[in-house]
Amino acid sequence: MAVLSGDEIRKLIQKEGLIRDYVDLETQIQPNGFDCTLRSVYRLRGCGRVDFDNSRRELPELEEVEFRDWVYLPKGVYRAKLNEVVRLGNDIMAIARPRSTLIRCGANVLTAVWDAGYEGRSEVSIVVHNDYGIWLSRNARIIQLVFIRLSSPTKGYEGVYKGENIDS
């Protein structure tokens, strides 16, 4: 396994469509990853349910938080949709980490692993810990995706979130 460099990520974007719908490629490519940006934010309006085999999985209802250029988020938990559509081959996975400025402002981003074979416009959770809240601009860079090449190709992700939000 190896973490992909910014140059390798750029080549995969150009040749294989690793990422599309980005805001500014030169700004978003980093030495060891790619910065993903904020498209929309939602308040959770209910309870979720998680089980072993997803047969009784229920996601909370959402209410979109409207914003033009900026949005103020008071302390709490939110779901956010990213601008970028990621398309991973069966030999690449990704892990996301919050950008350090977000952490220094008292907020964090929670994510799952991007499995090999996943394609979609992902959603993440934003947790605002700061008692005074946080202001986020549309297209704010909130996470850095780190891409890891697997030691060998694997069966690609086929779960319910494959293809999510591509048309939205």
UniProtKB/Swiss-Prot annotation:
Taxonomic lineage of the native organism: Archaea, Methanobacteriati, Methanobacteriota, Archaeoglobi, Archaeoglobales
Residues of the signal peptide: none
EC assignment: 3.6.1.23
Swiss-Prot/TrEMBL catalytic activity: dUTP + H2O = dUMP + diphosphate + H(+)
First-tier enzyme category under EC: hydrolase
Pathway involvement of the protein, from the record: Pyrimidine metabolism; dUMP biosynthesis; dUMP from dCTP (dUTP route): step 2/2
Protein name according to UniProt: Probable deoxyuridine 5'-triphosphate nucleotidohydrolase
Domain of life of the organism encoding this protein: Archaea
Entry function: This enzyme is involved in nucleotide metabolism: it produces dUMP, the immediate precursor of thymidine nucleotides and it decreases the intracellular concentration of dUTP so that uracil cannot be incorporated into DNA.
Species in which this protein is naturally found: Archaeoglobus fulgidus (strain ATCC 49558 / DSM 4304 / JCM 9628 / NBRC 100126 / VC-16)
